[in-house]
Amino acid sequence: MSKTNESLLQRRQAAVPRGVGQIHPIVAERAENATVWDVEGREYIDFAGGIAVLNTGHLHPKVVAAVQEQLTKLTHTCFQVLAYEPYVEVCEKINAKVPGDFAKKTLLVTTGSEAVENAVKIARAATGRAGVIAFTGAYHGRTMMTLGLTGKVVPYSAGMGLM
């Protein structure tokens, strides 16, 4: 049986929780630069790019080379458990770009939810205030704190009570 968008989306519906929404009714098979091909061979221009995390496009040669080189050294470790130099180097480079004559520190996280949660904690610690303003209809993530900030209930927290 050949793969189709419809058949794979049916499998997705059976295997993946409904909280992980999907905007487009296609299943990507491969991508390059700003182009994505679905499992049926149709070509699309990728305007989302991983929702703002893919600034270089799919399979940028420099990104692929850096990933390949890193895979020969270390695939993954939790920095909080075992530090590694590339993490420190990236933080140093980001810190150097931040304007101002004061000490800077950078935290690298995996998701936007983690970034939002840490930003809220930092803001609360810096101001001594507990309140946070969130806009109606805004999306901030899927963790408990970020769902509480997210003004878009459906599909993220519908039927779950107060966050």
PLM feature segments, named:
Residues 92-163:
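PLP-dependent aspartate aminotransferase-fold enzymes
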Residues 25-48:
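Active-site and channel-lining beta-strand-loop segments
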Residues 1-32, 87:
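Active-site-adjacent loop/helix segments that line or gate small-molecule/cofactor pockets in enzymes
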Residues 50-51, 55-82, 89-107:
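Glycine-rich phosphate-binding segment of PLP-dependent enzymes
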Residues 12, 16, 20, 71-75, ...:
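Structural signal for hydrophobic packing residues in well-ordered secondary-structure cores
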Residues 5, 29, 33, 60, ...:
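Generic structural signal for well-ordered, non-membrane alpha-helical segments
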